[in-house]
């Protein structure tokens, strides 16, 4: 019985997918909830462009799913910028620089 169980567990380990771990040194995802007309969103876009930082932008007026995500955050106002688990409401270059530095950017 023990031998059968051991054989099963070994075989199962051969066919089960390996766990996926974050790559060492991988940077946190940067996401911004924004609108096309928001002046602070424009400042954040320019900041990301100047520094060559890749980010995901979600226009909360054009994307239903994006608006639902924004609402689940309990957000008010734009932009809302996420750097991994850290959140910033509005735009402050100093604060965003610190969040990005803490995330390895």
Regions found by a protein language model. Give the residues of each.
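Bacterial N-terminal signal peptides that target proteins for export
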Residues: 1-8
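Thiol-based oxidoreductase modules, predominantly thioredoxin-like and allied folds used
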Residues: 53-66, 75-78
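Short glycine/proline-centered loop/turn elements that form peptide/ligand docking sites
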Residues: 11-13, 23, 59-62
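Soluble non-cytosolic domains of exported or imported proteins
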Residues: 35-42, 60-64, 90-94
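Thiol-/selenol-based redox modules, centered on thioredoxin-like
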Residues: 94-105
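Local sequence-structure signature of Cys/Sec-based thiol-disulfide redox active-site neighborhoods
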Residues: 24-51
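N-terminal signal peptide c-region/cleavage motif recognized by signal peptidases
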Residues: 17-19
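A short, hydrophobic beta-strand/beta-hairpin element that forms part of a small beta-sheet core
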Residues: 78-89
């Amino acid at each position: 019985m023990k031998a059968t169980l051991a054989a099963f567990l070994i075989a199962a380990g051969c066919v089960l997918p390996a766990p996926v771990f974050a790559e060492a040194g991988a940077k946190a995802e940067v996401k911004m909830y924004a609108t096309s007309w928001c002046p602070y969103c424009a400042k954040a876009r320019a900041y990301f462009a100047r520094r060559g930082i890749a980010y995901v932008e979600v226009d909360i007026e054009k994307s239903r799913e994006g608006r639902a995500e924004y609402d689940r955050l309990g957000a008010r106002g734009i932009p809302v910028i996420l750097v991994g688990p850290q959140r910033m409401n509005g735009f402050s270059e100093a604060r965003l620089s610190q969040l990005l530095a803490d995330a390895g950017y």
